Amino acid sequence: MTKAPVAPVVLVILDGWGYCEETRGNAIAAAKTPVMESLWTAYPHTLIHTSGKAVGLPEGQMGNSEVGHLNIGAGRVVPQELVRISDAVEDGSILSNSALVKICQEVRNRNGKLHLVGLCSEGGVHSHITHLFGLLDLAKEQRISEVCIHAITDGRDTAPTDGINAISALEDYINHVGIGRIVTVSGRYYAMDRDRRWDRIQRAYDVMTQDGAGDGRKAVDVLQASYAEGVNDEFIVPVRIAPGTVESGDGVIFFNFRPDRSRQLTQAFVSPEFTGFARQQIKPLSFVTFTQYDSDLSVSVAFEPQNLTNILGEVIANQGLNQFRTAETEKYAHVTYFFNGGLEEPFAGEDRELVSSPMVATYDKAPAMSATAVTDTAIAAIQKGIYSLIVINYANPDMVGHTGQIEPTIQAIETVDRCLGRLLEGVSKAGGTTIITADHGNAEYMLDEAGNSWTAHTTNPVPLILVEGEKVKIPGYGTNVELRSDGKLADIAPTILDILQLPQPPEMTGRSLLQPAEYDVQSPRTRIPVGLN
């Protein structure tokens, strides 16, 4: 007998689509979004928290895509690496971290140099500069004679020219502790690419590994000269300013804690079968990453991954159900690796499809990105009729929002809105239920109070809309479901399990957003047109 098609729950994550009443600098408010506006009017909706303690970050700390997807997939508030490592610096336990102490001993025994590589930023998304200060304290305590800092500048999770403040603070701390020097400077556009643009990684790698005394400038002078040419922190061209080449016998500590933008540069240093560009592997070279960037990398890890059990993908798999994940390159790791709690391998019954992002320098040049192809991929998965859960990420609001260009971001928002309309038609035909939400804010706030471009994330809440399916009945909730107003990202997984009528495991401490109803759940619902055609 042929199995009846599955009516799926489709989770749509609009990356960087925050909520803000202020319309100035608000690309979402300025965009024409008839689908989202109709859905907001016609269907149950709420605002949920995506920053600070609600997602395991310090109070007031903006959320990000990694943290957002981790919390969504885990169904609980996950203490973040930023807090974990900051606590180690604060309480001094970083000084006795076994992986960090060991690399210092190896470098000292070989009479080599210790290289500290990472994003010099207070953004708290990929790193924090206070973690670098902790490493300088460690190097001093371990009596390392030569400490070379390879500074990567931000301008994406911070203001575009905030790097000069971070570098100045670093120089002050170097003077205070009496150890270390900045030897190279590189914008994150080059050193932290995650889209296999190996030419960018090579620019940073070559500067770090090729001999040379440098041009003798101070790091702040490099930044000021770049600003004068209209080049902000993100795009600082890699440059050597002082001696300190990474070479045989040395040790490297990569102090970024977020994996996705740290993998490629690490691969260039340690992978024996590396093919991104021609290079001679440096041996021996001790290498420590702050967190686990990839289980296949031959490195030591200072802060081992937390073990998350009974996360959403695992629960779906254990129930013998199928699931599907899709996103374009920029966000693919988020709907797979991060959504699965840092696991690389898919669960049983979990299918994935990567859609390539367009090969452009910055996404304001192609604001539609690959949203249409992502939509096509998702609709094809829905039409198979075999998936109980489908997870989709639209990267446009976040990736174009990060450029600081409002007009292209408006175009990006409008593209996603059109794609949503088409996607929802497909879900409706399958009798599925759609949850539309975001992982953090961005595109709703693109000008600061002084009118300057804002390229970072925000602490604003994000929308969540429940588009109820024709065939799906949600026992105990009635036909006009209400949603709680105090929710957070950790509540999404329990909500999905609620809709699928699956038990919530005790490890999943989030709470379903669905409000119990006092009326007959079988009473017919009058479908409200939402302008999807």
From Swiss-Prot:
Superkingdom assignment: Bacteria
CDD domains: iPGM
InterPro entries listed in its UniProt record: Alkaline_phosphatase_core_sf (IPR017850), BPG-indep_PGM_N (IPR011258), Metalloenzyme (IPR006124), PGAM_B_sf (IPR036646), Pgm_bpd_ind (IPR005995)
Binding residues annotated for Mn(2+) 2, in chain numbering: 15, 65, 439-440
Phylogenetic lineage: Bacteria, Bacillati, Cyanobacteriota, Cyanophyceae, Nostocales
Catalytic activity as recorded in UniProt: (2R)-2-phosphoglycerate = (2R)-3-phosphoglycerate
One Gene Ontology CC term in the entry: cytosol
Keywords: Glycolysis, Isomerase, Manganese, Metal-binding
Cofactor note: Binds 2 manganese ions per subunit.
GO molecular function, one term: phosphoglycerate mutase activity
Family membership noted in the UniProt record: Belongs to the BPG-independent phosphoglycerate mutase family.
Pathway this chain belongs to: Carbohydrate degradation; glycolysis; pyruvate from D-glyceraldehyde 3-phosphate: step 3/5
One of the protein's GO biological processes: glycolytic process
Subunit structure and binding partners: Monomer.
Entry's EC annotation: 5.4.2.12
Active site feature: 65 (phosphoserine intermediate)
Gene3D superfamilies the UniProt entry points to: Alkaline Phosphatase, subunit A, BPG-independent phosphoglycerate mutase, domain B
Cofactors: Mn(2+)
Protein name: 2,3-bisphosphoglycerate-independent phosphoglycerate mutase
Residues given in the record as substrate binding sites: 126, 156-157, 188, 194, 258-261, 331
Classification via SUPFAM superfamilies: 2,3-Bisphosphoglycerate-independent phosphoglycerate mutase, substrate-binding domain, Alkaline phosphatase-like
